[in-house]
């Protein structure tokens, strides 16, 4: 239902979830909810336009990501579902500029502080070489942080204790880690 979709969108969007992941998770049942597939009426209600369809289908990467989503519906139904999911993500990002700005800050700090080691303090957090110092004195650690250029020349970051445990790192993921770690600090104080 719409309430569950909104809840799912807010939870994922806060940490940088993209439309393809959102669309896929809705089809399988986001966070234990029953599967949801958006239809034409819902897409129209969201304000999906013919231009949105043209823009979406005109970008090869969108179509590739859409085709990689496991589905049992038709291609047309999947396209409508993806257009609606993308519209929700776009609306969230437009309306939640402070959140998006924090992802962008954290994304820049992955390179400048966590990788290059330039200390930076943001409110109660200190970003430094491969770690973020929390108000409790504990640290979030990102060992062996490395960056590799993707096909568009953008640096994609990963970290881990060894080659088998490497994980992607990006601004939204850093925000998620910070929120969870600070929440743990608060709970431990209670």
Task: List the predicted regions and their residue ranges.
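Conserved catalytic core of nucleotide polymerization and phosphodiester-bond processing enzymes
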Residues: 1-190
């Amino acid at each position: 239902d719409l309430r569950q979709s909104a809840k799912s969108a807010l939870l994922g969007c806060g940490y940088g979830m993209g439309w393809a992941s959102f669309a896929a998770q809705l089809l399988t049942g986001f966070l234990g909810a029953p599967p949801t597939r958006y239809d034409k009426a819902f897409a129209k209600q969201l304000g999906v336009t013919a231009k949105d369809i043209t823009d979406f289908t005109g970008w090869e990467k969108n179509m590739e990501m859409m085709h990689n989503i496991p589905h049992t519906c038709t291609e047309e139904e999947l396209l409508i579902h993806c257009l609606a999911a993308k519209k929700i993500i776009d609306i969230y990002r437009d309306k939640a500029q402070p959140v998006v700005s924090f992802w962008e800050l954290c994304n820049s700090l992955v390179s400048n502080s966590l990788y290059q080691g330039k200390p930076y303090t943001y409110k109660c957090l200190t970003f430094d070489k491969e770690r973020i110092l929390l108000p409790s004195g504990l640290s979030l650690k990102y060992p062996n942080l490395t960056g590799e250029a993707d096909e568009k020349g953008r640096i994609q970051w990963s970290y881990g204790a060894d080659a088998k445990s490497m994980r992607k790192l990006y601004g939204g993921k850093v925000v998620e880690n910070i929120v969870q770690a600070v929440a743990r600090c608060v709970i431990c104080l209670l």
